[in-house]
A protein has these predicted regions:
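Short, exposed beta-strand "edge-strand" segments with a Pro/Gly-rich flavor and a Y/T-containing core
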Residues: 19, 33, 99-100
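Alpha-helix N-cap/loop-to-helix initiation residues
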Residues: 5-9, 35-36, 64
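An alpha-beta-alpha
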Residues: 1-23, 130-144
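Short, well-ordered alpha-helical scaffold segments within catalytic/effector domains
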Residues: 13, 36-43
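Short beta->alpha junction loops
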Residues: 2-3, 28-37
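Flexible loop/turn connectors
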Residues: 27-28, 40-145
Length: 145
């Protein structure tokens, strides 16, 4: 998880807890600043307590990248020993080795909707507020099996 009190962090955490609980598992949450170095250090300091065949479900791709770096630094294999799933899918998921499985946000669709809303507000002097929900998509790559 992230050490932020923001709506998106709470939403991601709730989704994780609900899903893990639904399949009969107990959720484990560790909160970090959104820095890969914090996640890497966590792995390096928790080395003796890590249970193989665990999948790290990370609040961001940046944290997932740090988990990956930490696991590689202690000599374990991803995805053979541990799985990693990130969240965002905007760049970092593609630069890691192995490439990260991620929950990809609909960034293009968000931008298009934002532009359309802005044009509508300008053309029609529209001051109303609206919310739109965009669902992420699971993109399976090399960090899970």
């Amino acid at each position: 998880g992230l050490e932020l009190e923001e709506a998106f962090t709470k939403s991601r955490e709730k989704g994780y807890i609900d899903t893990v609980t639904k399949v009969g598992q107990a959720p484990k949450i560790y909160r970090f600043d959104n820095r890969s170095s914090a996640a890497r250090k966590f792995i390096q300091t928790q080395n003796e307590h890590l249970v193989k065949n665990t999948c790290f479900i990370c609040a961001t791709d940046r944290l997932a990248l740090g988990i990956n770096q930490g696991l590689q630094s202690i000599g374990v294999e991803v995805p053979a020993d541990f799985g990693i799933i990130g969240y965002d899918g905007v760049f970092l998921d593609q630069v890691s080795s192995p490439k990260l499985t991620t929950m990809k946000q609909a960034i293009v669709e968000m931008g298009e909707a934002c532009g359309e809303l802005l044009i509508q507000k300008i053309e029609h002097n529209d001051t109303s507020q609206r919310q739109q929900r965009f669902l992420p998509q699971l993109v399976v790559r090399e960090s899970t099996r």
